[in-house]
Regions:
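Serine residues within intrinsically disordered or low-complexity segments
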Residues: 5, 24-27
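Bacterial N-terminal signal peptides
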Residues: 11-25
Length: 314
């Protein structure tokens, strides 16, 4: 009997390990599955603000030409000084975006807010402590009780290998034409804190001085037969954007390079933290399944689970 039970135990273990190997063959698929199937925690800042609106604890004020933008920023404690401006058509309301009408993006530690002049909606993403990024729209039509609506279509771009396979954030640098359309045949860059300056800010406005280094911002492709050639000298060390578009349309007249660099660092960090949290939960769920099947104490971690969560050196 002892040998028989041992063989059964071994077969169960082999079977379960096989399932885990199959499931672990793509960490992107696992993380995306866990993140997408988990219910919202309701603990992200936008969900919290919606509860306060529903309970009449706060109100959103509407102001032309920005709609609810300024009030949303105030309630979510997002500073206007975080404003960055992107004129490439690489977001949801792309047909309204151009070098003459860039999209404004504002952020703090846990929220990103996008506004386009004349846009139907505010585009908002917030950091959920378990699921990663949560995406919302807020209709810009004046309403008695504005509603933040969760939108899954944002995941078409915001859940991919570029975001580590989870709902996340990304900053892109492209070769835009004079209408803001990315010339994708020239390629593009995903920007984070490790990116060299020369590959940053294609399709973005950039204000501030940066010495002799050059970047891709403030300019667009002139010759579509040579889409990877930008006059980076013309876009360097720009102090004012008044010659590019009507800056009075926006709450601020700038798109500060320091704000851009913080944004690029933060989006990558948010994705890494979310990925680590999701994969830790995956490891614990798989550990629980194996332990229960073998009749062992669930609370006792195996060495392999400990290494997956804490790393090889722990």
């Amino acid at each position: 009997m002892h040998n028989g039970s041992g063989r059964v135990r071994l077969l169960i273990l082999i079977f379960l390990q096989g399932l885990l190997v199959v499931r672990s063959s793509s960490s992107v698929v696992i993380a995306a599955d866990i993140a997408s199937s988990s219910p919202p925690t309701g603990r992200d800042p936008v969900a919290s603000l919606q509860r306060r609106l529903d309970q009449r604890e706060v109100q959103l004020e509407y102001a032309t030409p920005w709609g609810y933008l300024l009030s949303v920023l105030k309630q979510l404690q997002v500073p206007l000084s975080s404003q960055t401006l992107v004129f490439s058509r690489t977001s949801f309301q792309q047909f309204l975006i151009s070098p003459a009408t860039p999209r404004a993006l504002y952020f703090n530690d846990t929220v990103y807010v996008g506004w386009v002049p004349g846009g139907d909606v505010l585009e908002i993403s917030a950091v959920d402590p378990e699921r990663g990024a949560m995406f919302y729209f807020l209709n810009q039509k004046k309403a008695a009780t504005p509603q933040f609506i969760q939108r899954e279509e944002c995941l078409q771009c915001h859940e991919s290998p570029r975001t580590l396979g989870i709902p996340g954030h990304l900053v892109r640098s492209v070769f835009p034409d004079s209408d803001g359309l990315p010339q994708l045949q020239a390629g593009s860059y995903q920007t984070d804190h490790t990116s060299p300056l020369k590959e940053r800010w294609g399709g973005w406005y950039v204000t501030g001085t940066h010495g002799s280094q050059r970047h891709m911002g403030n300019v667009w492709v002139i010759d579509k037969d040579k889409p990877d050639q930008l006059n980076t000298e013309a876009g360097a060390n720009v102090i004012s954007l008044q010659s590019y578009f009507q800056v009075s349309t926006y709450p601020r007249p700038d798109s500060d390079l320091v704000a851009l660099m913080v944004l690029e660092h933060q989006t990558r960090l948010h994705n890494l933290l979310a990925k680590a949290g999701i994969e830790s939960r995956v490891a614990q769920e798989q550990q629980t399944a194996v332990k229960r099947a073998l009749g062992e104490p669930v609370a006792q971690w195996s060495e392999s689970t400990r290494r997956r969560i804490h790393g090889q050196d722990d």
